[in-house]
Each structure stands twice: as structure tokens, then as C-alpha cells.
Amino acid sequence: MARDYPLELYRNFGIMAHIDAGKTTTTERILYYTGKSHKIGEVHDGAATMDWMEQEQERGITITSAATTTFWERTEDGKTPLSPKHRFNIIDTPGHVDFTIEVERSLAVLDGAVCLLDANAGVEPQTETVWRQADRYKVPRIVFVNKMDKIGADFFNCVKMIKDRTGATPAPIALPIGAEDKLEGIIDLVTMQEWVYQGEDLGASWIIKDVRDELKAEAEEWRGKLIELAVEQDDEAMEAYLEGNEPDVPTLRKLIRKGCLAMAFVPVTAGSAFKNKGVQPVLNSVIDYLPSPLDVPAYMGFAPGDETETRNIARSADDSQPFAALAFKIMNDPFVGSLTFTRLYSGVLKKGDQMVNSTKGKRERVGRMMMMHAINREEIDEAFAGDIIALAGLKETTTGDTLCDPANQVVLETMTFPEPVIEIAVEPKTKADQEKMGLALARLAAEDPSFRVETDFESGQTIMKGMGELHLDILVDRMKREFKVEANIGAPQVAYRETISREAEIDYTHKKQTGGTGQFARVKLVITPTEPGEGYSFESKIVGGAVPKEYIPGVEKGIKSVMDSGPLAGFPVIDFRVALIDGAFHDVDSSVLAFEIASRAAMREGLKKAGAKLLEPIMKVEVVTPEEYTGGIIGDLTSRRGMVQGQDTRGNANVINAFVPLANMFGYINTLRSMSSGRAVFTMHFDHYDAVPQNISDEIQKKYA
């Protein structure tokens, strides 16, 4: 069966933003206008189509990225199609900091993005985080300044904030007509026409007319700026413009597209999804300015087993190339079981095909294939390059794995996942719960790589580790609801780390003589601190065979066994390197095990000698508050060992930026609510590890001794 839609009509894009910028509402409107959803779901009612987990509907936030396929043809009057029908594969991503990992996963497989801003708040902390992630994956984007109906909405302040906070060049392609309760519609700067919405019904009707006289001067000024940015993308257009010839509308659109794809600037439009104003122009802009899979460079991968990971195998959006795809999300579906969301980069995949998970070197078979619309699914028999589909029943595949043609193997991107910063102990209430809990935690960990499960060997407790309090709350909640596990939950604990403060040299000999074959190994190690974030490395500087090659893996194994449990309080040791510079062996009594024991003892001694110190996670905190509470909030942050970095204003609110140890931020939301009568809000995310003051370090060591 041939493909229904040529690749140039595909748009794989995500909707990204800060929490509460109206992302799910905007996606709901898009699904409504593109005809996939006949009743608009409001987040306030807990009925939004994309938010399909129970917890999402209760909390009114989006936790997991749901993928949806829908269709749109460019229109200006809402009736006449001005382009062929385009196929949109949309990924709705969460805006809460604890779920940054979901955003990371979806950006890795998208070609473009629509970034939403709250017209009142502008570029917020999570917007900056997501923006940086999108920069890293080189994802072209357009900006929709949403909530223009809100009190304090300021489009031009948002445009300024894009420039100041992200460093990108904003290029408004539309201006709002009015704001707050006077919002009427937008001025399209490309065509110089007004879109005036009639009432606030489902945006079904609007009038297109010439720009009214009182708005003309401002619109022409902004159009001039847009044209200047656009003609910079093409020498001929620039020459013509300098000779006094402005580009016509189709040429201007092509130039804006070129600039957007090159990430030279970011097209910006405006509206209010909740009031059904300005969403159709966003859909038109997705067609006009965001890339199709053909506009994106070939995806480079490396051959399985290539330790240098030299990326010299290209896979581009072409059905005739060998099949290659990336699994970017695992989801547990109540009816189908495990679903693996997959982006096809090249080739064709048919039901029943054999494929290889090249990341793990395991074979998989294609069972059921589905096109997803939030929680509804449509069974399909084949998928093509550029498609985003869900595969049911894969046994070995987890997030970030490559699936490919067995005869033409390649490993595509491997995603990087952050280390958890917070942990809680969970204990099942009954024996039956214990068995269910093991299964539940394994499932949840397969779905979410930023969530880890470990067993504390000393206490025998199960430890859940995650990215924040909300993250772990929701996982515990899912364990209870989806897997019916009853468990007792401990108080949250900080994931401390240990490191060293100076270089140390250790010469250690391990000897054991008990009749028969003995054990003998001598190692001389140098332990050196590295820059924060550099991690651990090992190097053998042995020359002349003082320690034979076959024993060196034993040395490294011994070192690694000590890294998991540092000398101060048993936390993992980070940011150091070890060099093996000398040693000795015995022809009969030496073995890999003897060298492992020797290096383990040498490391224990060496870490103490190198001045071990305790590190704690430091969070970047932003508090937005009415001015009258500023003094009290700053005082409270300082009392939590916080370092206030500065203040700013946003609209009529004050913005306080600070670095605060995570250990002092538990339950902060309740304190902030009572201090500000519920009017202040805060966001925080992990920034770096820093040394714990000695008096607090002593307390922690006593607690964990």
C-alpha cells in the first residue's frame, strides 16, 4: 500500500511551554478545529482529551506527552482550503519542571515546535529550560502568545522577553487587536489584513478585512521590521528590497519559512485559545513555517558495537531507505498493555515484520501497530518514514532505543537522562502488596527513565528516586491506582553525593596465605579531584608489565565497588579520576579477584586521605510575588540557607531568583502560601551540587552512620 500523504505535507511538532500557559487548552482547540474531537475538553472540567491519566485530570496539569495525528488545510475564511491537506503529528508535552524528561524525549523526535507564552507572565523559568532543550536538539519553532484575554496581557513585553531571556530574535507575524476583555482578533502582518472574531463561540466565524486606519501606522512599522528580517535570508530578495521593491505575499512567506528553519529568527503570533481567538492562524503558521521531515538534515547514527560511536551512517526521510526508528516513550495502556511510541526516520514498517533493537542487540517482532489520538487508537498495517506510531507488545525495548532493519543495522541517538535528586522509602503493607509492588515499580521505571528504583542493602527498604516531590507523588499515586498496591511512604530524603578535595597517592598490598594457593596483589593509585560535573574516569599508566593487562579490569572493578558508598555517609562518590601508576604481582598467587580486593582497600584509604566532603543538590528557585510580600519571602529564603541572586519585575509582580539547598525546600509550597495568602507562586529545578557546610555535614554523617 502506498503512503496517503507525501512527506512534504507532514508536520511533526510539539507544543511546549511553562505550566499554566494554556498548552493543553490550545491542543484541545487544535483537535477541535482539525475535526478530531467533536467536543472541546476544558482543563478546568478535567475533561481534556490529551490529559488522559486520572491524575492529570484531577491536578489539571499534563504529565505524559500524548501523541496525536490529525489533519489541516490552510484556510483564511474557515471554509475554502488554500493548501493541500497536511498531516499533523502533534506531541503535547508537560510544562511542570519535574517532568522535564518528558519534554526532552519528545523534542528528540520532533521536527518543529510551537512554544506558548502566557501573555501576562511572558518567558517563565520552565519556558527557558524547554527553550534551551529545543536549542540543543536544533528544533525550529514559532511562538504563540496565548491568554491575550487575561488581565495584564502585554504582547510587546512578551516579544521583548523572548529577546532578553532566550537570546533569540523574535519576528512578530501578527499583532493582537485589543487585549484583556477587549481582544477582538489579530492583524496578519504578512497579508496586512485583520482577522476579527465574531463572539466567543468555538471561533467558528471571523471576518477578514483591511486594517483599520487607527492601527495602520503601528502595523506598517512592525511589518517593515518583519520584511527586513525576512529579506536577510536571500541575497536576491535583499537586493530587490534595497532598490525599493518589497517581496509579495508568497515570497515573504517563503523567506519567513527559510529564516524560521535556519533558526535565524522566531515567528511570533498572538491570541487566546480559551476564548477561541487566533488558533487557526497558528495552524496556518505550522504549515507555512515549520519543517516537514524533508527539511530536516539526515539523522546520523553509528554501527552497533562501534565503541568510538562514530556517526557515519545517515538515515533520511525516505521510504526506499532501510527501516530505522527511535522509541521515545513507553506507556502502559489499560487495554493493549505496553505501548512503545516510535518515530520512523526512514523506510517502511509492516505488521509482522522482524526488526532488531540495535541498542540492546535483541530481536523484536511487529505485532499491532497503531496511530494514536490521545487515548483513542486506530489500527494500521504499515507505517512510513516520518510517521509517529505506537507499537504494542515489544518485549525488550525501552526509551531511547533504536529499532531497525536486521540487514542494515544502525544505532541512532541515545538520550541523556538527568540523575534523580530526591528519594523516598516505600514499604508494601502486605505480602500480596510486595509482589504487586515489584511489578508496578518495574513497569513505571520502564516508562520513565528519570525514575529509579533501588534496594537499600542495609535496611532492605525499597527506595524510589525522582526529579521532585510532585514527580514521586504522582508515581506513588499511579502505583496505588493502576496497580492496586497499598504501601507506606517515608518522608522525602535528599540524594547527597560525596567527592574529594585534594589529590592523594596510595600504595596498598593485599596478601593472604592460608596454605595452598594464596592471594597477592599490590596497587599504587593516584586519586585526583575533577571539575564539578565531569564524573569519574580511570586510566592505567602501567608500563613494563608491573601489573599484567588481564588484572587491570579487576583493579577498576574494585574502584567502582567503593564509588557507590562513600566513606562519610555512604553516598555515591562523584567527580574524581583514578590513575593506576604502579603495582606488583605474583606468578601463582595473583588473580583478578586479588587485584579487585587490593584496589577496593586502596580506594577506601585513598578517599579519606584525599579529604572526602559531602555535596548537596542546590535548586534554582524563582518566586513570583506581589510586592508587599517580597521582604518576608527573601528573609525566609535566606533562613533556608538560600543565596538570593537578584530581583526583577514582571507586570505588577516582583520576581525573586535564588539558589537554595533542596534539603531546605521540602514543604516550601505551604509556607509560601501562608506567607502570601496564596498569591505568590514558585518554581524550582536542580542546578548543581555544592559542598555542605561542616556543621550540617557532621549532622548528616551522624544520621547515616
From Swiss-Prot:
SMART domains: EFG_C, EFG_IV. CDD domains: EF-G, EFG_III, EFG_mtEFG1_IV, EFG_mtEFG_C, EFG_mtEFG_II. One of its GO terms (molecular function) is translation elongation factor activity. Residues 8-294 form the tr-type G domain. GO terms for biological process: ribosome disassembly. Pfam families: EFG_C (PF00679), EFG_III (PF14492), EFG_IV (PF03764), GTP_EFTU (PF00009), GTP_EFTU_D2 (PF03144). GO terms for cellular component: cytoplasm. Its main location: cytoplasm. Keywords: Cytoplasm, Elongation factor, GTP-binding, Nucleotide-binding, Protein biosynthesis. Disulfide bonds: none annotated. It is found in: Cytoplasm. InterPro entries: EFG_II (IPR041095), EFG_III (IPR009022), EFG_III/V (IPR035647), EFG_IV (IPR047872), EFG_V (IPR035649), EFG_V-like (IPR000640), EFTu-like_2 (IPR004161), G_TR_CS (IPR031157). GTP binds at residues 17-24, 92-96, 146-149. Catalyzes the GTP-dependent ribosomal translocation step during translation elongation. During this step, the ribosome changes from the pre-translocational (PRE) to the post-translocational (POST) state as the newly formed A-site-bound peptidyl-tRNA and P-site-bound deacylated tRNA move to the P and E sites, respectively. Catalyzes the coordinated movement of the two tRNA molecules, the mRNA and conformational changes in the ribosome. NCBIfam families: EF-G, PRK12740.1-5, small_GTP. Belongs to the TRAFAC class translation factor GTPase superfamily. Classic translation factor GTPase family. EF-G/EF-2 subfamily. HAMAP family: EF_G_EF_2_B. This is Elongation factor G. It comes from Cereibacter sphaeroides (strain KD131 / KCTC 12085) (Rhodobacter sphaeroides). The lineage of its organism: Bacteria, Pseudomonadati, Pseudomonadota, Alphaproteobacteria, Rhodobacterales.
